[in-house]
Amino acid sequence: VQSDAPEVRTAAQSAIETIEGRLAVIAQFQNVWYGLSLGSVLLLAAIGLAITFGVMGVINMAHGEMVMLGAYTTFVIQELFRAFAPGMFDLSLLVAIPAAFLVAGAVGVAIERGVIQFLYGRPLETLLATWGISLILQQAVRTIFGPTNQDVSAPSYMQGGFEFLGLAITYNRLWIIVFTLVVFLALLAVLKLTSLGLQMRAVTQNRRMAASMGIRTGYVDAMTFGLGSGVAGIAGVALSQIDNVSPNLGQNYIIDSFLVVVFGGVGNLWGTLISALSLGVMNKFLEPYAGAVLAKILILVLVILFIQKRPRGLFALKGRAVEA
């Protein structure tokens, strides 16, 4: 039965506007969720860089390859489970996390001891050396595993999703956010509650004073680089669940990682957290209007303008410097 009564049309129009308004609100909250998800990925990729860059002042262009090594470690672990324990495949990620940390951490220590320790105070040479190392690692992985994407599967508890108040939430993104927070809190505990963390904070604030107090800055540098690289390897485990595992995986995140670290404040983990989540949400809100590429460009421009006004980032570390 159709009716042209004005009150019916008015009621229908009002109902349509209400529904459209509700859908618009849900879409905005969906963008926030996507932004937090992207921010957690950026945080995982950047948090290790925040440690090494903050303590050592080293621009490590091979940081993305530590992420890539973590992803390939996950692939190898899953292949071993498929071959020898297919019934326990859901445990593969739990095994891959410490394995990726050890592999990437060991490579990081080797890079610091073998190359970077001879280049402190020479930022251009360090940048070029680490860029060369990144190319070597990419080619080594490409030679061993091939140039094509590798199949890394999600365990059963990370498949599927659910709807909450109209929001579409996938389990893999949800688990990555939870995992990111756990890694972040674990790193805070290491920095605040351990002897190594105390020494790292001392070297970050004033390297010369720390050395004069008997802290072995060379040892701290090696352990810091290993810790930062290990955390990047853990990030690779998470990224293997949402991105293609290829030799170029790390290159997709290295620029964003530096952007997060510089925007948040070098060496400040809380600044890195807020920076990553903020940039992730901003990116997802800009994408519907500007597109994915232009959104990244706009964010880069905004960060550059912000750094010009506040060169030390959102949260600058406090410390006393000794002038030469």
Language model regions located:
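Pore- or pathway-lining transmembrane helices of multi-pass membrane proteins that form conduits
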Residues: E65-L69, L119-R142, L249-V262, S278, ...
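Cytosolic-side transmembrane-helix boundaries in multi-pass membrane proteins
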Residues: E125, A129, I144, T148-N149, ...
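Loop-to-helix entry region at the N-terminal start of transmembrane alpha-helices
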Residues: Q30-V41, S92-A96, F164-A186, D221-A222, ...
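Single transmembrane alpha-helix segments in multi-pass membrane proteins
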Residues: V32-I77, A110, G114-E125, F263-L269
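Transmembrane alpha-helical segments in multi-pass inner-membrane proteins
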Residues: L93-L94, P98, F225-V237, Q241-V303
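Helix-loop-helix "hairpin" substructures at the membrane interface of multi-pass membrane proteins
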Residues: A168-V245, I274
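Alpha-helical transmembrane segments within multi-pass membrane transporters and channels
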Residues: G87-I133, A140, I274-L279, R310-P311
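Conserved hydrophobic register position within alpha-solenoid helical repeats
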Residues: R9-I16
